[in-house]
Amino acid sequence: MLALLWFAVPNASQARETLTWLLRDLPPSTLFAGTMQGQGAIDQLMPILTARMPEYDHVLMHVNRARAMQMLNDGAALSCDPTMLWTQERARTIIYSIPIFVLFSSGLIVRKEHLGRFEPFISQGQINLQALMASETVKLGVVAERSYGGLIDKTLDESDEQTLSLHYGSDAVGSLLQMARAGRLDGLLGFWFEVRYQALQQGIDPQELVFLPIADNPLYQLAYIGCSDTPEGKHAMQLINREMRTLRESALMGFYARWLDPEQQQSYLSDVKVIFDKQ
C-alpha cells in the first residue's frame, strides 16, 4: 500500500512541478508509526529541505525498496529517494547527490548465544563474509534489493541463494530480527543503529546481540539522495545539492547521531565533519 503526504509551501505560484519523495520504512531513519512517528533522522530532514525548495509541490510517498527502484528507473515522473547508497549499477539510471549523510557501515548481526558457530570466520573482531557464505553453513536475512555497500553486495551476488532469506515487504529489518530470534535465521545483515532500534521495540536487550564488522569493509559508508536520471531530475538535483551542502552538517548529522549508542556519538560527529570537509 502506498501512503501519500503533501507538503504545501505558502505563497508559492501555481503550476509547479511535483517532486515525489520515495520513503521506505527504515526505523530510525524513517518512523512511520508508533510513539516516535516522524522523529527519524530523514523524517526530520524532509520538512526542512522541502521548505527550502519552493519551486516544487512536494509529495512524500511510502513505498518498499522494489517499488522505489522501479519508479526511479522508469523516470515517468520526477522522483527522488533520500536514503540511497551508491552502486555502479544504479548509477546507470539514477543521478546521485553529493554525500548527504555518513553511516556506520553495515555488518552481520547475530545472537550472542549463537556466536560460536561464526568463530571460525572471525579474526580481530571482524568476520570474513566471503568465507562464511562460501561455507554454506548458515542462512542470513537480507532486505531484498537493498545495497549494503560494494563489498557486501558483491559477496551476496556470488552466494548460493539457499544461504539467503530475502525480505521484500515493509518493516523488513524488524521482521528479519524476529526470524533470527525464532531460530529461522542464523543472523542478518544490516546497519547496527537500525537493528538496535528494532531490538528495543521488540523487547530484546541489545546486549543479547553481537554486531560483527565485515573484514575489509570501511568504518563508514556515504549515503545520498538519488533522483530519476532525466532533465527534470538533473535540475532538481542542482537545487538539492545547493541546500544539502548546508543541511547535512547543520541538521542531518545531528539527527542521525541521536540514534547511535551514546559512546559513539561524539567521535561520530567529529569524524563526519572531517569527511564532509573533504567532499
Predicted regions and their residues:
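A ligand-binding cleft/hinge motif common to bilobed small-molecule-binding domains
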Residues: 73, 82-93, 153, 186-208, ...
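Short loop->beta-strand "edge-of-pocket" segments that line small-molecule binding or catalytic clefts
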Residues: 17-32, 39, 123-150
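Periplasmic-binding protein-like
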Residues: 24-27, 102-107, 203-241, 266-269
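Ligand-binding cleft/hinge of the Venus flytrap
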Residues: 46-54, 133-170, 199-205
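Extracytoplasmic small-molecule ligand-binding "clamshell" domains
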Residues: 15-93
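Short helices/loops that flank or line small-molecule/ion binding pockets
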Residues: 52, 61, 66-79, 133, ...
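Acidic, polar ligand-binding/catalytic clefts
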Residues: 60-134, 213-216
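Extended ligand-binding regions for polar small-molecule ligands
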Residues: 43-53, 110-126, 134-135, 139, ...
